[in-house]
Structure formats: C-alpha cells, structure tokens
Amino acid sequence: MDNEKGLLIVLSGPSGVGKGTVRKKIFDDPSTSYKYSISMTTRDKRQGEVDGVDYFFKAKSEFEELIKQDQFIEYAEYVGNYYGTPVQYVKDTMDRGYDVFLEIEVEGAKQVRKKFPDALFIFLAPPSLDHLRERLVGRGTESSEKIQSRVHEARKEVEMMNLYDYVVVNDEVELAKQRIQSIVEAEHLKRERIEAKYRKMILEAKK
C-alpha cells in the first residue's frame, strides 16, 4: 500500500435498482480491495440481511441522537425511514490509503457531494421504470402502495443523474460490476490524482 490517499466511491440509485446486489457481486470478487462503509438505517431488516454486515439497524430514537452528535457524513429520510453514513470510519480508512465504497440513497449522495467534492459518484440506473417496478414487486416485501411510492420517487431520482460522474445501467449484474470496476481503475489513473506524486519525485531527483 502506497501513500496515495484512498478514493471515496459512491454508488447510488433508485430503491429497487439492485444497488445491494451489485455491491455484493463486487465484494465477492477476490480481486476487490475496496473497504465497504456500512450504512446505518431505521428500516426493517429484510430476509437474509445481517446487522453489521449489510447495514447497522437502529431504532429511530438512536439514529436521531447520532444526528445531534454530527456523527454522519450524510443522512436522509426516505419513505419513512432514516439512512446514514457514519463519518469516522470513512475518513480513517481513506487516510490509510484504502478506497471506501458507499452504497447510499440518492438524497444522501447529494450531501456527500458537498462534503467530499472529489469523491467518485456512480449512478446505478434501471433499464426502464417498468423493469424497476417488476423488481420491487418481485421482492414480495412491500405493499402495492409502498411500491407505487418508490416508483414515484425513482422517477424524480433518475432526473437527478446529472449530479453524478458516471451512469451504469444495471441490465445484468456481472456487467454492472465490471463497468464499476473499470470506472474506479480509470479514476485512479487521472492526472490530477498522480501529478503531485510525480512532482515530488522530480523535486527529490534534483536535490
């Protein structure tokens, strides 16, 4: 591990687009070296989810106390539930040279952009809104009213993709994973990220 500061990778998109599925695919890849920043939420745990692995599940009162203590990079209330990203883990991990991967809601990503303007923002988009609705129905975890609410929110969120650096369509999970990995690799090769290191090398060579 060199002294280059880690990159903050923000993956966001509408509810039901498959953010969690794509994230799991990325982290199941043995070549992945990112550190996953686990978000905190007050929503109910879904089947198969593990506290402290997929999310930190908290009561609403606990979450609101942490907000008062300014313990989040971002937080948002979405369809009646809070979601947030604990701040200290992210800063410490990046300072150690690791890339940190955030999987968050669109509203939360807007807050991260203000605090971490140099982060890498990737919008995960559905092939279509009809496809998104089918995914939500297929979950079998929410009422038709809740699904309609999420699809309505998704329309507004798709219109906000101009706030992101890249858009990846989740038409196939493996392809989405590969596209995201390629984007991160290219981001590390940007001149702005490596120029300072080479300037320092040149100055030291002149001594």
UniProtKB/Swiss-Prot annotation:
GO terms for cellular component: cytosol. It comes from the Bacteria. Residues 6-185 form the Guanylate kinase-like domain. Signal peptide: none annotated. It catalyses: GMP + ATP = GDP + ADP. Keywords: ATP-binding, Cytoplasm, Kinase, Nucleotide-binding, Transferase. It is found in: Cytoplasm. The keyword Chaperone does not apply. Its main location: cytoplasm. InterPro entries: GK/Ca_channel_bsu (IPR008145), Guanylate_kin-like_dom (IPR008144), Guanylate_kinase (IPR017665), Guanylate_kinase_CS (IPR020590), P-loop_NTPase (IPR027417). Gene3D superfamilies: Guanylate Kinase phosphate binding domain (3.30.63.10), P-loop containing nucleotide triphosphate hydrolases (3.40.50.300). SUPFAM superfamilies: P-loop containing nucleoside triphosphate hydrolases. Its EC number is 2.7.4.8. It holds the Pfam family Guanylate_kin. ATP binds at G13, P14, S15, G16, V17, G18, K19, G20. One of its GO terms (molecular function) is ATP binding. The keyword Nucleus does not apply. PANTHER family: GUANYLATE KINASE, GUANYLATE KINASE-RELATED. Belongs to the guanylate kinase family. Essential for recycling GMP and indirectly, cGMP. NCBIfam families: guanyl_kin. This is Guanylate kinase. It comes from Staphylococcus saprophyticus subsp. saprophyticus (strain ATCC 15305 / DSM 20229 / NCIMB 8711 / NCTC 7292 / S-41). The gene is gmk.
